[in-house]
Amino acid sequence: MNIHEYQAKALLREFGVPVSRGVPVLKASEAEAAAETLGGPVWVVKSQIHAGGRGKGKFKEASAGDKGGVRLAKSIDEVKQFASQMLGATLVTVQTGPAGKQVNRLYIEEGSDIDKEFYLSALVDRETSRVAFVVSTEGGVNIEDVAHTSPEKIVSFSVDPATGVMSHHGRTVAKALGLRGDLGKQAEKLVAQLYNAFIAKDMALLEINPLVVTRQGELRVLDAKVSFDDNALYRHPDAVALRDESEEDAKEIEASRFDLSYVALDGQIGCMVNGAGLAMATMDIIKLYGMSPANFLDVGGGATKDKVAAAFKIITADPNVKGILVNIFGGIMKCDVIAEGVVAAVKQVGLNVPLVVRLEGTNVDAGKKIIRESGLNVLPADDLDDAAQKIVKAVKG
């Protein structure tokens, strides 16, 4: 689960992390009071959306002006002007796609006198099963681009959970960033604070880009992105309260209500599969035959008829879906339950695109019989390869 920048900074402030002062606003009329509270003489007006690249982004509406989603204001009048232009407008960035995202919140922040910019993040390293830090002298840019063009400028290390963060971890960061003396000590302290926040709040990602050195010789977090581990949210009702569903895909929200593992993608073939491994294999073979999946959807091993029906409705609600592939290998999951759910959903919402169903495993004959006797226009498949070829052919016509 992601949260907004201003929420992330408020959370980090609780752990002593040095962040700039700021005030979130939901209405343009609140901008003046926010700016006066901060005092100036320079303010930064930041769009709050769950996507990166805001500064280089562009608004769709001409009324929002030709500047990006992060703007420097040198007067309170400019703060008010930018707030009026940006709130309610649609910001398009490299991460939003062409549709963009509507800006419903702004963060008015005090300006910083920046000397240097760095990159620093903490994340879960799946290879070592530890929290890892990633550090780079290239701040304020996309870290993936740095990894591609200048990998030697990235330093990473993991933290042993038995010891937790230690002073040498902070010194590693300081050395990687060329920070000495008091700034080196600040880096040591910051790494410990970030690690403590990461562990205490069960984060999946904590990204600071950029981390800056001000001309006053202070380390400061200028931008922060926090993502929580969804599986640990039950332990953090305070984090759940920060959720902004308007920033999330409506289909993913609906899927979460039925405990379905669903991720929206950009393709045209909807997929309903049981098991993450089989789901990924299904997506791969669709790509192999020349098309792209519209989603990742794992119904799990113990799905009920209602859960399967909900999954099917979520897929059909996507206007980009031009065909659907149901691929089930029944172990704990029974093929007849899948069949009943699919039939029930189709009868409720209709079927306007080709549907290919491949069933194998527990109660497969009963499942195939339910599909066959339903009267629905369903293309049966004998195996995964056959299913993929049939749905691609049906969609391409």
Curated annotation (Swiss-Prot):
Cofactor(s), names only, from the UniProt record: Mg(2+)
Source organism: Nitrobacter hamburgensis (strain DSM 10229 / NCIMB 13809 / X14)
Pfam families in alphabetical order: ATP-grasp_2, Ligase_CoA
Subunit structure: Heterotetramer of two alpha and two beta subunits.
Residues reported to bind Mg(2+): 209, 223
Cofactor note: Binds 1 Mg(2+) ion per subunit.
EC id: 6.2.1.5
UniProt cross-references to InterPro entries, sorted A to Z: ATP-grasp, ATP-grasp_succ-CoA_synth-type, ATP_grasp_subdomain_1, SUCC_ACL_C, Succ_CoA_ligase-like_bsu, Succinyl-CoA_synth-like
Binding site for ATP: 46, 53-55, 109, 112, 117
Record-listed substrate binding positions: 274, 331-333
Superkingdom: Bacteria
Family: Belongs to the succinate/malate CoA ligase beta subunit family.
Entry GO CC: cytosol; succinate-CoA ligase complex
Sorted UniProt keywords: ATP-binding, Ligase, Magnesium, Metal-binding, Nucleotide-binding, Tricarboxylic acid cycle
Role: Succinyl-CoA synthetase functions in the citric acid cycle (TCA), coupling the hydrolysis of succinyl-CoA to the synthesis of either ATP or GTP and thus represents the only step of substrate-level phosphorylation in the TCA. The beta subunit provides nucleotide specificity of the enzyme and binds the substrate succinate, while the binding sites for coenzyme A and phosphate are found in the alpha subunit.
Protein's UniProt name: Succinate--CoA ligase [ADP-forming] subunit beta
Catalysed reaction equations from the record: succinate + ATP + CoA = succinyl-CoA + ADP + phosphate; GTP + succinate + CoA = succinyl-CoA + GDP + phosphate
UniProt-listed GO biological process terms: succinyl-CoA metabolic process; tricarboxylic acid cycle
Pathway: Carbohydrate metabolism; tricarboxylic acid cycle; succinate from succinyl-CoA (ligase route): step 1/1
Lineage: Bacteria, Pseudomonadati, Pseudomonadota, Alphaproteobacteria, Hyphomicrobiales
GO molecular function: ATP binding; magnesium ion binding; succinate-CoA ligase (ADP-forming) activity; succinate-CoA ligase (GDP-forming) activity
Residue ranges occupied by any ATP-grasp domain in the UniProt entry: 9-254
